[in-house]
């Protein structure tokens, strides 16, 4: 069984438990004052395994499934036996990295809560875009696929605009920083291991897309 599927199963089970138990929800949700005042750093991780509702859970997990399977397999091909471990490490660290700006901004805000795997899923999606920028991404209500290298910047710009606007209850900051972390992780892992020139491969695939 793949790491992606295992993470999805765990996330679904924990989220379902939280839907039916306010105690589980409150114990696992990302609440910055609980981190700064009570050293409950585990919340950086646990909040990624609970969701606000069924729609939130479904959208995150279906996105994670399709991109995660591809990225996990690519990591195994590139990094060999260490690939799956690196993939899991990227996902878990992305949960933390994507929330650090949120924490610094809201560490004394007793009214702030955040939950969901979006930051880590964003890291996986953008690692996938870096691996295969020409792969087309399909969205609801748009009758054509958008190449990853076009979708990525557009997604980040829209997320930044929505984050600045601040008119909804979505943590767009986590999406943005999760995306940056996924890109950075693959670049660094490829460089340190000497097994993958992520930037070079990305540029070559984009050039091939325009020349084909």
Task: Name what the model sees in each region.
Residues 1-212:
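A detector for small-residue-rich transmembrane helices and their helix-helix packing motifs
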């Amino acid at each position: 069984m793949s790491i992606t599927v295992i993470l999805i199963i765990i996330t679904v089970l924990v989220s379902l438990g939280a839907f039916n138990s306010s105690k589980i929800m409150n114990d696992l949700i990302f609440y910055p004052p609980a981190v700064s005042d009570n050293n409950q750093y585990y919340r950086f991780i646990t909040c990624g395994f609970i969701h606000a509702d069924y729609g939130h859970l479904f959208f995150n997990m279906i996105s994670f499934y399709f991109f995660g399977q591809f990225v996990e397999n690519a990591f195994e091909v590139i990094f060999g036996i260490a690939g799956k471990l690196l993939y899991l490490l990227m996902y878990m660290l992305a949960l933390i990295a994507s929330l650090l700006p949120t924490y610094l901004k809201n560490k004394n805000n007793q009214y702030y809560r955040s939950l969901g795997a979006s930051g880590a899923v964003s890291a996986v999606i953008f690692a996938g875009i870096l691996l295969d920028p020409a792969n087309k991404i399909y969205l609801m209500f748009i009758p054509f696929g958008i190449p990853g290298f076009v979708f990525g910047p557009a997604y980040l710009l829209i997320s930044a605009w929505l984050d600045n606007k601040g008119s909804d209850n979505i943590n767009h900051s986590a999406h943005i920083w999760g995306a940056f972390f996924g890109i950075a992780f693959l670049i660094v892992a490829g460089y340190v291991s000497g097994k993958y020139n992520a930037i070079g491969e990305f540029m070559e695939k984009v050039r091939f897309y325009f020349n084909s």
